[in-house]
Amino acid sequence: LAHEFVHTVQFVNGWHESVWTVDPEVRGSISHDRELTYYLVLEGAATFVENRYVAQYAPGMADGDALRRAYQNASAYERLNIARYHLGAEYVAERVDSPADLERVHRHPPTSTEQVLHNSTDPIETLTVTTETGNWSDRDRDRQGELFLRIALRTELNRSTAVDAAHGWGDDRRITFAKENRTASAWVLHWDDADNATEFEAAFDRYLDAKASANGSVWEQDDGNATYRVVEATNETTVVFLGNETFVRSATVNTTHETQFDIEVES
């Protein structure tokens, strides 16, 4: 009940509206990363209060490691859901000393999962991606964010490697292309610096090695029909092409500025 009462306070006072903001870079919608951030704050605040309440009024029921264990043992999909409670509560606990201070974390919320993971105010880097689609259509674009990246890498890598590889995330744009019944993506990842880019690329090679087989310049998924190709667009930007093999083999990336890129797909 303490947990749900916090949600009542959040909505009655309009705190949730301060956290929910759109991303013009993803066509005026809320990005996947910003949506995760929203739930990390809302559920993290409620879980923080719940933990405080249990510790004070029902100490025999307290199990501070329960969420951590659940998160560690979960599937990737489950981790994305449990993170809002586990990692969100950790973030709120670092931001406030008391439940009485919760309004502050809502009125001045984080703008990315990166800020939640590191309790930082690092801004999202500038990244612009244009497309020349040929006979393909640019169907959707989104910002996935550091938390999504970390959890995705964790499916094939150990925790420390996945965390280190995702650290240094500056911005990303995942663009989905479609042609008839075929789909593919270009995932442009911009890093804080060249060292972070290099670390990610090395880890991603190991990630691919665990789930796919190298075939020339591409990787072919062992238990599916997905194809992957990794391109170093600049020393601070990595592009991962994935999905339909024809798309992955033919797509190119052109650098028009250090943070501006054009994805071109052959007809």
What are the residue ranges of the model-derived segments?
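Second-shell loop/turn segments in exported
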Residues: L1, G28-Y39, S75-I82, S185-D192
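Short alpha-helix carrying the canonical HExxH Zn2+-binding catalytic motif
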Residues: L1-V9
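Extracytoplasmic/secreted proteins, especially bacterial periplasmic and envelope-associated proteins
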Residues: E4, T37, V41-R52, A83, ...
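Long, terminal "pre-/pro-" and other extracytoplasmic accessory regions
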Residues: V6, W15-S29, D33, T37, ...
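Post-HExxH zinc-binding segment in Zn-dependent metallohydrolases
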Residues: N13-D63
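Alpha/beta-hydrolase
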Residues: E50, V54, M61-A74, N81-R84, ...
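Pan-zinc metallopeptidase signature
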Residues: S75-V188
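C-terminal soluble interaction/assembly domains
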Residues: N181-S267
